[in-house]
Design a protein with these regions (language model features):
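Cap/insert and terminal regions of metallo-dependent hydrolase folds
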Residues: 172-256
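Binuclear metal-dependent hydrolase catalytic cores
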Residues: 1-176, 188, 237-257
């Protein structure tokens, strides 16, 4: 999808979980396909918003970020949480050159490894307060609490023409987050969905059943699944049960904002 008149685009840089696709040592059909065809691979969950000649990075799951982001400079970074598969790209990035890069995210005294102690060009900002909007490059950003094993935020992202909710990693949504997001007309909801339907609720990440519950709760115009594992990919190849406006995102997909 092309950018809108404001030149704002949302990029899925990675749509996999920490395991990624292909999973190490796995010989299932999905992982074999991904080994042969780069288009079927899923790198660690990561996204970016490009605004003309600059980037707002959402998480840093890719160990080597530069090839995916050139030639645009990273102006800001939003972190959902400090699990390694969402921040590993910051470790080489911090020793780069150029202006300091403001980094926003939830409160977490431990952070990840020594990022806080040795931030390099990363400029970690005071922790965000849920439901308090702020602005980056003319885009309104509001953090919302999620449900995960580590304190995690999703983000409501509002441009002059579109509204998007980015909601990973999570298992369901807290009632206050549902109430807040339901008050907005969402063009897009990007929702964690790591597993095919489960008989009992999974831990930390949605399955298809819980992701579709979020679809019903928030009623977005379009919902995109992300943080997808190889088992869900296998299920998606054999099922046609997703509602018309629910899609599995893939690495490289872009949405106009």
């Amino acid at each position: 999808m092309a950018a809108n008149s404001e030149g704002i685009v949302f990029h899925f840089l990675g749509t996999g979980g920490a395991q990624q696709v292909p999973a190490f040592g796995c010989e299932c059909e999905i992982c074999q396909q991904a080994q042969r065809d780069e288009k079927k691979r899923r790198r660690a969950c990561c996204a970016a918003i490009t605004t003309q000649d600059r980037i707002i990075l959402i998480d840093a799951g890719l160990p080597e970020l530069a090839p995916y982001l050139l030639p645009y400079p990273i102006r800001h970074i939003l972190l959902t949480h400090y699990h390694m598969d969402h921040v590993q790209g910051l470790f080489p990035l911090r020793w780069g050159y150029g202006d300091p890069i403001p980094v926003f995210g939830p409160p977490d005294e431990a952070g990840c490894d020594d990022l806080f102690k040795h931030p390099g060009i990363l400029h970690f900002q005071p922790p965000l307060t849920p439901f308090q909007p702020f602005e980056l490059d003319g885009i309104s950003i509001t953090s919302v609490p999620l449900i995960h094993s580590k304190l995690t935020y999703g983000y409501l992202i509002q441009t002059p023409t579109h509204t998007l909710a980015y909601l990973t990693d999570t298992i369901g949504l807290p009632p206050e987050t549902v109430q807040f997001l339901s008050a907005h007309t969402l063009d897009y909801a990007i929702v964690d969905c790591s597993h095919p339907p489960q008989t009992t609720p999974p831990r930390n990440h949605n399955d298809v059943t819980r992701a579709l519950e979020i679809f019903t709760q928030l009623n977005p115009k379009q919902l995109y699944l992300t943080h997808i594992g190889h088992e869900l990919d296998r299920w998606l190849q054999t099922q046609t049960l997703l509602p018309e406006n629910v899609h599995a995102a893939y690495d490289g997909l872009v949405l106009g904002l």
